Amino acid sequence: GSQTTTAKIGDYFPITENTKYVYEGMGNEYASYTVYNDYTEADKLQQRLNNGGTETVNIIQIFEGKLIKVFAESEIYYRENFLVKQDNDTEILLMEPLQKGNSWTLTDGRVRSITDTEASVSTPLGDYKAVEVTTESGNGKNIDYYAKDVGLVKSIFKEGETEISSSLAQIEKDVPLIQNINFYYPNINDEKIYYKNVAVNFYTNDVTREKLAQAYKGEPVANTGKVFSENTQINSLYLNDDGMVYLDLNKAFLQEMNAGAGYEAMILQSIANTFGQYYNAEKVILTIEGKPYESGHIALQEGEYLQVNYDNVIEGS
């Protein structure tokens, strides 16, 4: 009808916050997945897609009448804002005008076209009228359905007798992404490091370093000491291209630490393990206000890192 001619991509791909989408798969163990938007801007989102096998970060942008996947990377289990990133190879998911027959060729040679604007689709969550997008490749085809004010409601892959589908089963609003994170603490009495697994809630656009600092100030494992004192703050935290985690703390961390040399070394080991493990890295560069870590007992040289070490580590409670 006439209303579809003025339809905008934003109507069919809303940018949501604090919302979890659950897709039910058929035909393949990895066809079931969840989606959560870690970060959003006015016309752009960074989604975390978890299919039980891996977690993939996708950045999707609405730009000049196109819905474009500008960045994708799998095996990203940590939260980091990648909204500025862009791959050389971007993929147009949907394009205006949202009219039957609108067609475009992808960089890999596949042809994608709008094959219906009012397709009837049934999912476990309900029935929708959707824009149907068909992508033809050599052997098979993908069909994606976008419903107004909802977004992607169903995807189907067909090849010969094979059919794999993912259908929207649940939309959970006002919920966080929950990550289970190990926090490590030193026990000076037995000279061992204990960890406890903490469920940390991240809402859309939460700043990871702030949430981790807050969680690290929580109740430590019994008979262990605190690692982050009350006024400790993380100034910056990221996984660098060199594979090392860069962690910069404020002066309060040093000023409020009351530890002998051996205990201080255990505190630093606890930090290395906590942040190294979160980013699945082996090495952590620790600085204070941008300068190499230096206390009365321990001085790290420029570029000297703390090595993650799980020997003598015990699960606490």
Each model region followed by its residue ranges:
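Conserved functional acidic sites
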Residues: 3-178
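Bimodal "functional hotspot" detector
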Residues: 1-3, 161-317
